[in-house]
Amino acid sequence: MAEKIPKPVSKRLVSYYMCLERLLDEGVEVVSSEELARRLDLKASQIRKDLSYFGEFGKRGVGYNVEHLYDAIGEILGVKKEWKLVVVGAGNIGRAVSNYAVMREKGFKIVGIFDSDPSKMGKEAAPGLTVSDVSELEKFVEEHGVEIGVIAVPAEHAQEIAERLEKAGIMGILNFAPVKIKVSVPVENIDITASLRVLTFEIVRRNN
């Protein structure tokens, strides 16, 4: 069994990858953990500790080869693979996700979108993507080898949809519903309102 990596590490790993991408664009060939830390507002020791979960990178006193580290982290994150996704919920969020072109550019291909509203069936949610009946969800996931499910349904239906996705063989879930779901596969919760509350807390705190 693979070593369990703390979730904050995986989130920072994405930040490292994006920072290294910018460094490559700038033509930087070697970078120190101190410079990465400065750019990301972290401690250099934290970066070194995070990377140590995955092996040895760089040389003491020299730094990291930017291209090598970028490729290595990309391999860890699975960026070279094209991931198949389905969206459940063809409301505003579901359609917005389906139309987000950057996802396809980054290796995330939405292959289906589902809803329970008969008035939405057969309508185009995004270019080349029409809404299907949610009753067909499991069959579609199994037949197309879908790996990631995106939940964009009301809170009261999120747990049921998550369980159906898991049973169908989904490997991970991106959850936009404002409720925590409990399944055995990895879940990433995106709660826009909660994030805004954190932001307003910081604003109020700064201005008091």
Swiss-Prot record:
Can you supply one Gene Ontology CC term for this chain's record? cytoplasm
GO BP terms: namely:
negative regulation of DNA-templated transcription; response to redox state
Q: Which domain of life is it from?
A: Bacteria
- Which cysteine pairs are joined by S-S bonds? none
The record's section on PANTHER family has: REDOX-SENSING TRANSCRIPTIONAL REPRESSOR REX, REDOX-SENSING TRANSCRIPTIONAL REPRESSOR REX 1
The UniProt function text for this chain reads:
Modulates transcription in response to changes in cellular NADH/NAD(+) redox state.
Query: This protein is called what?
Result: Redox-sensing transcriptional repressor Rex
Gene source species: Thermotoga petrophila (strain ATCC BAA-488 / DSM 13995 / JCM 10881 / RKU-1)
Gene behind the chain: rex
